[in-house]
């Protein structure tokens, strides 16, 4: 047993994409700061950031229909889509800066150009997609998008999906070539390799057991060294909790007022993966459909080309499951252990409100392989059962909180930074769009936790991320310049997406 306190400037909990991004930003902005990372698993990027544990979509709202909603008058609200796209551009710029500065290399190992497509069936959905296309096409971030409801065009765009299709039901698709497939596991590992060269102390198989405030205002982190069995105590001026689903229980241990009245609802994900390489080669896009009526946003079905271990793969899903674990490697007691006196009413209210979600999850858990194949055949009519296996993806913990708009126990579907009033500690909660917006979210952490430093840091931030603080929607020329330059640096030689 060791009770010796070891001091440092910054502690990052969890070796996923969020800690990797924050650590990389801080090492560029304050290179003299000492940083320690604690990760329970044996290496970086093994939980939610791992390439098999998420969809690998560079979420920029090019194809995800849940980011555009239909108003009562039939018009399309694109505000959320624009926001998500703007946020992804920040990630793209930062990654390009890292590559150009030779801090990370071989961008093709973590990002590949890939068309993003939306596909719908039925007259009403075709009309919705056309209206969506027309609304987005007016925005410079989405120029280059094509729409078609012509069967011959759809056969060219989607040969695997259109082959063997017998229904005469109207279909339509949009296609944009500037989409990406991102291997967040590979990117996370690259970033931590870079941080290691900057003397960041990486501690794997180190589990954080407790976090408490010391009398002198520092944070003391109690760590179990799983290699030696020893208990260590580390103190820091600033702590970031980036432990994916494991962040909520650690945030609760801090006791900060901002951690109260927040709950978490774990949802597990399953994907079907194609093991017939001949089928894999017939598809080249991320194709997102429309969630069924009454299904939650997380259930949007998609058929994705992926690049994993430098090999082309084909995945379909997600299918939801239920597990009380907050992490894939977590405990069955995670959910019950997160219920506290200050959030029990919030959790109970959510339970009453979300009966539809509960019913949906139960139905999903009960699905047989053949029932899942039936859902896949809505995308690929000729899909054969023997060509597809199931892969268990990561756990996502949806935030439950009390809101003015939704009332007590409202389920949240985004990511959220929770920080202490004095900015000394912050945690990231939630799920989608997640890793794609890591740079935007970590800039938010910097703004919340280091407000007095932002003026000093602004010049360097803009060197790394030129559109920081600027709306690209309102600056189409800047968007075109940045899109072209980052595309060149990252090896994304897609068609030019902005037309004059």
From Swiss-Prot:
PANTHER family: L-2-HYDROXYGLUTARATE DEHYDROGENASE, MITOCHONDRIAL. InterPro entries: FAD/NAD-bd_sf (IPR036188), MQO (IPR006231). This is Probable malate:quinone oxidoreductase. Keywords: FAD, Flavoprotein, Oxidoreductase, Tricarboxylic acid cycle. It is an enzyme of class 1 (oxidoreductase). It comes from Bacillus cereus (strain ZK / E33L). The lineage of its organism: Bacteria, Bacillati, Bacillota, Bacilli, Bacillales. Pfam families: Mqo. It catalyses: (S)-malate + a quinone = a quinol + oxaloacetate. Pathway: Carbohydrate metabolism; tricarboxylic acid cycle; oxaloacetate from (S)-malate (quinone route): step 1/1. NCBIfam families: mal_quin_oxido, PRK05257.1-1, PRK05257.1-3, PRK05257.1-4, PRK05257.2-1, PRK05257.2-4, PRK05257.3-1, PRK05257.3-2.
């Amino acid at each position: 047993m060791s009770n010796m306190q070891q001091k440092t400037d910054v502690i990052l909990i969890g070796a996923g994409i969020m800690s990797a991004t924050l650590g990389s930003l801080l090492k560029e902005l304050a290179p003299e700061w000492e940083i320690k990372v604690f990760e329970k698993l044996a290496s970086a990027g093994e939980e939610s950031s791992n390439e098999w544990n998420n969809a690998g979509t560079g979420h920029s709202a090019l194809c995800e229909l849940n980011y555009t909603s239909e108003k009562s008058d039939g018009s399309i609200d694109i505000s959320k889509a624009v926001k998500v796209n703007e946020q992804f551009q920040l990630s793209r710029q930062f990654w390009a800066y890292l590559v150009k500065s030779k801090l990370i290399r071989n961008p093709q190992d973590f990002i590949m150009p890939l068309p993003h497509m939306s596909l719908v069936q039925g007259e009403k959905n075709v009309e919705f997609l056309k209206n969506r296309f027309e609304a987005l096409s007016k925005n410079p971030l989405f120029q280059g998008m094509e729409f078609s409801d012509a069967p011959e065009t759809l056969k060219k765009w989607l040969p695997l999906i259109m082959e063997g299709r017998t229904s005469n039901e109207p279909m339509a698709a949009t296609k944009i070539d500037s989409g990406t497939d991102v291997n967040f596991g590979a990117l996370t590992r690259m970033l931590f390799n870079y941080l290691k060269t900057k003397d960041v102390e990486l501690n794997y198989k180190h589990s954080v057991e407790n976090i408490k405030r010391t009398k002198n205002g520092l944070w003391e982190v109690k760590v179990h060294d799983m290699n030696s069995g020893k208990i260590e105590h580390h103190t820091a001026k600033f702590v970031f909790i980036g432990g994916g689903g494991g962040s909520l229980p650690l945030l609760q241990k801090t006791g900060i007022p901002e951690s109260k009245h927040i709950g978490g609802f774990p949802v597990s994900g399953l994907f079907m993966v194609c093991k017939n390489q001949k089928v894999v080669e017939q598809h080249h896009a991320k194709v997102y459909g429309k969630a069924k009526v009454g299904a939650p946003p997380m259930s949007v079905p998609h058929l994705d080309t992926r690049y994993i271990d430098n090999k082309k793969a084909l995945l379909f899903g997600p299918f939801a499951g239920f597990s009380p674990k907050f992490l894939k490697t977590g405990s069955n007691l995670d959910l019950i252990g997160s219920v506290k006196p200050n959030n029990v009413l919030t959790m109970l209210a959510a339970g009453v409100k979300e009966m539809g979600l509960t019913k949906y999850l139960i139905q999903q858990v009960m699905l047989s392989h053949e029932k899942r194949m039936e859902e896949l055949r809505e995308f690929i009519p000729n899909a054969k059962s023997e060509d597809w296996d199931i892969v268990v993806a990561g756990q996502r913990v949806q935030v439950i909180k009390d809101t003015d708009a939704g009332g007590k126990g409202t389920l949240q579907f985004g990511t959220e930074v929770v920080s202490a009033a004095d900015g000394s500690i912050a945690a990231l909660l939630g799920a989608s769009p997640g890793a794609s917006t890591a740079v935007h979210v970590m800039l938010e952490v910097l703004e919340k936790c280091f407000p007095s430093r932002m003026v000093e840091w602004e010049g360097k931030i803009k060197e790394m991320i030129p559109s920081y603080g600027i709306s690209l929607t309102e600056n189409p020329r800047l968007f075109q310049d940045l899109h072209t330059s980052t595309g060149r640096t990252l090896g994304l030689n897609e068609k030019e997406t902005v037309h004059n």
